[in-house]
Structure formats: C-alpha cells, structure tokens
Amino acid sequence: MNAPAEHANLARQHLIDPEICIRCNTCEEICPVDAITHDSRNYVVKFETCNGCLACISPCPTGAIDSWRNVDKATPHSLADQYSWDYLPDTTELDQFEATVMGAAELPAEVQQITEVATAGQGGPAMAPWSASHPYVNLYTPANPITATVTGNYRLTAEDASSDIHHIVLDFGTTPFPVLEGQSIGIIPPGVDEKGKPHLLRMYSVASPRDGERPHYNNLSLTVKRVVEDHEGNPTRGVASNYVCDLKKGDKVQVTGPYGSTYLMPNHPGSSIMMICTGTGSAPMRAMTERRRRRMDRKEGGELVLFFGARAPEELPYFGPLQKLPKEFIDINFAFSRVPGEPKRYVQDAIRERADKVFQMLQDDNCYIYICGLKGMEAGVLEAFRDICRAKGADWDALRPQLLSKARFHVETY
C-alpha cells in the first residue's frame, strides 16, 4: 500500500542508534551492498545504497542497527548528520505513514490490488497502533522469492465437513524472515496458467506469533481453505489453495513478503483486543491470541474478546484448542449458522447479544478492534455496531472515524 498522495515521496530510512551502538563493525562487515560505513564517532547507513535486505539486523549484538525513520526522499538524513549524532532524531508525524526502504522493490501489483479490496470497508488502510512493533515488508519478491520447507500439514476441519481447511507449517531455515501477527505472505504456485504465464502469487495471513509456530524457531503457520467452488457456488479449482493444501512434509515452497504494515496488534500493557472473524479469517486472530498466551505470565493486563462464526463446530478452524483456553484469558463467542435443529446464528448476532460488553470496548481507548474473513460478513458486523451505539445513545457513524484516527479499527475482508 502506498502512502497518501501528500506523503507519496516518503521513504523508510535505515539508521543506527549511536547511543547503544558498541562500534563492533559487525554490520559493516556483513552488509552485502556496502551501505554501512563509519568514522571515529559513529557507524552510519548510506541512504541511496541501502536496499533493506536486513542482512545486518540479526548479527547486531545490541539492536542498534534496527532503527528507522520516515523521511522525504529528497531530504534524508545525510551522512554528515548521522556522523554528528549522539542519539537518534525524534520521530515525527511522518512516521505514522507507510513507507518503503529506498531501493527496495515495489509491492507486487496483485498484493496492492488485494489489499485495496480487503481494506475497503474501513476506507483504506488504517494506521498501526502506536505501540505496534516495526514490520518488515516486501523483503522477498516474485522475482527473488525465499524457499521454505513444509514441516507440517494437517486438516483442521472434520473429514465429513463441507470445508477442507488445513494448518500448514513452513520453515525458513537460517534465512531471515521476520514476521508479525497480522501480516501476510505470498505463495507462488509452480507451473503456468492457460496462457503460459507463471501463476500469480496468492496471499495468506500468518496464523502464528512473531516467535514462530514453534517458539524460537524460524517458522510460521498458515490457515488455508481448499477452494472448490466460486462465490456463486459453481465448481472451480483454486490453483494456489489446492497446491498448498496438497503439500507434503519436506516439499519446497516459493514464498514472498512479508506484507502488511497496519493490521498489527498493540504491544503496550493494558491494551485490549476485540477480534471478529469467520473461517480462515481466524488466522491473524490465532496469531494475536497465541502471542498473548505465551506472555500470560507477565500479567500485562488487557482483555481478549473473540467473536467467531462458522457453519458448524466441525467446520470451525481450531475449535478444539480454543475451547481449552482459560475463560479468564479470552472471552469466546461462537456463532454457528448451519447446526441441525438450531436457528441460524451469525457473528453479528453474537455481537448484539454482548451489546454491553461491545459498547464498553468501543468506548475504551485502550481497545483495538480487528475484523477478518468473508466480505459478506462486513455489512452485518457494522450494522450491529450501529444498532448497539444507537441503543446506547451514541452514533456509530461519528465514532468510526475517531476509531480510525486512533488506529483502533482494522478491517481485512475478502
């Protein structure tokens, strides 16, 4: 996604924090494009040379190298500026916008198109929460993908369920692939289409937290539904989804990304998260929930409330594991629309049933709302918010812009 027009000349400048740099020379030695140099005071990064490859990030013993500021492409921080610093310059209003590293590849057209569709419900991409971690974006492109190895693939839904949803684990070995909760990756199916052209990449949300599906491993997981019919119910075969669902342990996969710099979770203690999803829209919610679960012992506070819709329990990804989570950790509200003998119940119905709680969270500046799933769910969820606000004497149409301006409202529907 590009910056707004008035900020179209933004670039993400890579810098080194002089306060914590120990001048060990590791970054300069490892940089493959000679973008790092130094004088007697500071180590600095050449703006016009750095391509954002991140080869220097992991080896740095202090983390000084992992510093970034948004700047105008025409007036970046010069080498003379950097040599003179005792500490990094303060962040500015420019740092709230999305920007790419100068010299880094542009986002693939299909990624931009999918993102525009997914975020249309909120009026375009929102800002990331103020406490979100810095995301790395577009490190690997269709022209230069990374190869991952499949280390796991198992079906999440029952064998007799109408939806065939798989949990896929990909390992990147020793090659850096930093990813955050809420980000996506691209997978390039092998072969060519009917016109003889390579298949386009397909984006999938990451379903694991930043430290890996297996903690402290360089891997991640995906939640993928096998596509066997189109939106009208006509038989079709999704090229990418069938390829991914059929992967075997040990198979090699071409991956691009990561993608996404705004659909990110808050990190500050006391922050709450309301999650609303259907089907494979549960992937980013699982990532955020697992991130919080692994940090439960820190007692950082903040609530997790989940509204999760599916046709039936056997078609709901992660239904079993979700039921085992402590109720004091997460407040789960299921909605099933195709259970025999039961009335149809959709995710917006579950939201209305929790009107008091939902309104409380909408009013809480420390609560962040995330919606992900089918495009068809979006209108019903927003109407439920509107009805709840109206019943409480508030105006949803006035509240939503406030949520967006505070980076508290995030929508990705397809």
UniProtKB/Swiss-Prot annotation:
Swiss-Prot/TrEMBL GO biological process terms: catabolic process
Gene3D superfamilies tied to this protein: 3.30.70.20, Nucleotide-binding domain of ferredoxin-NADP reductase (FNR) module, Translation factors
Sites where the protein binds NADP(+): 274-291
Transmembrane segments: none
Domain FAD-binding FR-type residue range list: 143-265
Superkingdom of the organism of origin: Bacteria
Pfam families: Fer4_21, NAD_binding_1
Record text on subunit structure and interactions: Homodimer. The subunit composition of the active BoxA/BoxB protein complex is not known.
Protein's UniProt name: Benzoyl-CoA oxygenase component A
